[in-house]
Design a protein with these regions (language model features):
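Non-catalytic accessory segments of hydrolases
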Residues: 118, 125-310, 314-320, 583-593, ...
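Mobile gating loops/cap/lid regions near enzyme active sites that modulate substrate access
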Residues: 225, 530-656
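Substrate-access "cap/lid" subdomains that shape
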Residues: 230-232, 329, 336, 370, ...
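Active-site loop->helix "elbow" adjoining a glycine-rich segment at hydrolase catalytic centers
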Residues: 265, 322-326, 354-357
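Alpha/beta-hydrolase active-site loop
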Residues: 316-339
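Alpha/beta-hydrolase fold nucleophile elbow
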Residues: 341-353
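Catalytic nucleophile serine of serine hydrolases
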Residues: 352-355, 367, 380
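Short glycine-enriched nucleophile-adjacent loop
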Residues: 357-369
Length: 656
């Protein structure tokens, strides 16, 4: 995507190299020791490079070609004049001096490029050695000390504390940790612990408090199904999981900072904010004028289940969508308290992937969540992945009774957490997503959008081209196969007869050439993409501003896929975590996506001016139906239905 060596890069490298050489040569001619000569070379070279870079890549200089040329000539003339005076003063001819500097001017830029390529090659080789062809899915080498650090628990602080790292909220004073670029607060409770008599009950607000607490360590992740490729299974889990994490950029601003709130992914059954892929340090470090928040919510049998038809189940009327109620409670806490952290409660952008994206879409249609966020970045999620009736959740409740050999709600409430967790592991196939109940979530989410339920919310919607392999890498081959066959078998429930016939005919032709599992995987992936595309249409028809993004990058290891994992890492700048997931981040692409996300959060136009990011041309992200297409490390804006992709093939098949 980024040009490896633009003319601007050449000018900066050329003048900086002259600076390195100038520092070394002057020091040597002055009789300084070798060590001092090297030090002088490095100091002058780095200082000059930083100074020249700020000038050359400033918005004013990049505004026109004439400005750029004038700037290059002026800088070069000033520097050469200074060098000439210095060299003549020391009695050395300019020709001798330039011969001395030749190695610096030519060699240093080339050496820097070679070193960067070697580092990248080493990282790729290390990943390939660990993952092989990727057929085993995600295999994490989690260090014991990292697990122990993540699993530490915050404690009350009875005595003195560091006031510089403390923030007073309505629910307590929280003492975080400060580093060079951010201050972080981890494991802050946003609701009463849903344990004991509050198990399977709606989240309750915390009382006001003046107590002081540590906020240095992540709270426990939700109790969850532990899949083969889930990293969160290595960390502490508990029913007491309703906590959030806040990272504040170090830049002081006159006005409150915009806020980015992350909803974690995991198919509503696994995942959590302790996943290194979702860490919030790097984004506010790069963009210090904003606040980043992530949080946990209840999952699986603790978050999405219907007890209404079992004895005593009427006492838990909200169990059907508890995970969504937790999310609303988190957003309410954020809106009430984020001002204490320097955030703006009226400029909240939510971002979610997979089930996190689906959650956001449901909350956008939910009256109870009205006004809790103003913008949404959703990737690979759709309201069509939720249930239209509570039948499946009621069946799950009955299965849970059988698995735990209980017969009443009272019996379930008395069970130990581990007993329920073990039962959930055996019931993973039957786990439920949220349900449109007509109470919290409208019966018809698309109609709600049409009627203006999501009015006032801007959307960026993302689609991936290779998400199925990512899912396989997370859950393992057997679970993946079971899930794909089940999902495709359920498709007729969402299709009219004509469309269903077209889909089955398409599937039959694909199966003949690639095998049943691969064909159904492709169909599932394509169908999800079409559902997301339809979502963009519905939101636009409802009057919402919509931008579309299509991720079509190839994965480093084909069998691991390229989708949510790569996008999350690129947007949040978590390159080290991405290596754990078997890939290497394209730093240029990540920088561009982070810049566009920051503009979106801040309310600026979604465009890049020339060389705003060094080596990247001007770019304008036009509104839907145009899409930002990310492919082969490059950006372009076009409609995705003009691409010769499998999505287009399926669309054409249905149209026929």
């Amino acid at each position: 995507m980024k040009k490896i060596f633009t003319f601007d890069d050449f000018m900066v490298a050329f003048i900086a190299a002259l600076g390195y050489g100038f520092g070394e040569t002057i020091a040597r001619l002055s009789g300084w020791p070798s060590v001092m000569c090297v030090a002088a070379s490095i100091v002058l070279g780095i200082a000059l490079e930083e100074f020249i870079t700020k000038i050359v890549f400033s918005k004013a200089v990049q505004k026109s070609t004439m400005n750029r040329v004038f700037t290059y000539v002026a800088i070069l003339l000033v520097f050469l004049a200074g060098q000439y005076v210095s060299i003549r003063w020391m009695g050395v001819s300019m020709l001798e001096y330039l011969q001395e500097e030749f190695a610096f001017v030519v060699g240093l830029p080339i050496l820097g490029l070679i070193v960067n390529l070697l580092i990248r090659r080493y990282r790729i080789r290390k990943i390939r050695k660990r993952y092989g062809d990727g057929s085993e899915g995600f295999v994490f080498d989690v260090k014991k000390e990292d697990i122990e650090e993540t699993n530490k628990r915050n404690q009350p602080i009875p005595g003195g504390y560091d006031a510089d790292c403390a923030v007073k909220t309505r629910t307590g004073i929280f003492v975080g940790e400060k580093n060079k670029k951010t201050t972080s607060y981890f494991g802050i409770p946003y609701a009463k612990p849903p344990v004991g008599e509050r198990r399977w009950k709606a989240p309750e607000p915390l009382p006001s408090s003046e107590l002081v607490f540590e906020a240095k360590y992540f709270g426990a992740s939700a109790i969850q199904v532990e899949h083969k490729g889930s990293i969160v299974k290595h960390y502490r889990q508990s029913e007491d999981c309703l906590t959030l994490n806040i990272c504040v950029g170090g830049k002081k601003t006159e006005s409150p900072k915009p806020v980015l709130v992350l909803f974690h992914h995991g198919d509503f059954t696994f995942g959590g904010s302790a996943d290194p892929l979702l860490y919030g340090y790097n984004y506010p470090s790069k963009h210090p004028d904003m606040v980043f928040v992530s949080f946990n919510y209840r999952l699986g049998i603790f978050g999405f289940i219907d007890f209404s038809e079992i004895p005593g189940g009427k006492d838990c009327p909200d169990a059907l969508n508890l995970g969504l109620l937790d999310q609303i409670a988190a957003l309410e806490w954020i809106k009430e308290n984020i001002g204490a952290f320097g955030g703006d409660p009226d400029r909240i952008t939510v971002i979610g992937f997979e089930s996190g994206a689906t959650s956001i879409l449901l909350l956008a249609a939910c009256e109870k969540a009205k006004g809790l966020f103003q913008k949404a970045f959703i990737f690979n999620g759709s309201p069509t992945s939720v249930y239209n009736s509570p039948d499946a959740s009621r069946a799950l409740a009955n299965d849970l009774l059988k698995a735990t050999q209980t017969s009443t709600m009272e019996g379930l409430l008395q069970l130990e957490t581990e007993t329920l967790k073990d039962a959930a592991q055996g019931l993973w196939k039957n786990m439920c997503a949220p349900t449109c109940d007509g109470k919290l979530i409208p019966d018809d989410v698309y109609q709600a959008y049409h009627d203006g339920a999501a009015s006032g919310i801007e959307f960026i919607i993302g689609i991936t081209s290779n998400e199925a392999q990512v899912f396989r890498s997370l859950v393992g081959d057997q679970k993946y196969s079971d899930e794909i066959f089940s999902a495709v078998a359920d498709m007729p429930n969402y299709l009219d007869d004509i469309t269903a016939d077209a889909v089955w005919a398409y599937l039959e032709t694909q199966t003949a050439s690639m095998g049943e599992l691969e064909a159904k995987s492709k169909l599932f992936e394509q169908w999800l993409a079409l559902c997301i595309y339809r979502l963009a249409i519905k939101l636009k028809e409802g009057g919402n501003p919509v931008h579309l993004m299509y991720w079509d990058e190839e994965s480093l290891i084909e069998n691991l896929g390229s989708g949510t994992v790569d996008v999350v890492a690129a947007l949040l700048g978590n390159g080290d975590a991405l290596q754990m997931y078997g890939s290497v981040m394209n730093a240029d692409l990540s920088e561009a996506l982070q810049t566009l996300l920051h503009k979106y959060i801040s309310g600026n136009a979604l465009q890049l001016y020339p060389n705003e990011i060094k080596g990247i041309d001007a770019f304008d992200w036009k509104a839907f139906p145009q899409a930002l297409i990310v492919s082969d490390g490059k950006f372009r804006c076009n409609t995705i239905d003009d691409r010769n992709t499998e999505i287009k093939e399926l669309l054409d098949y249905i149209k026929q």
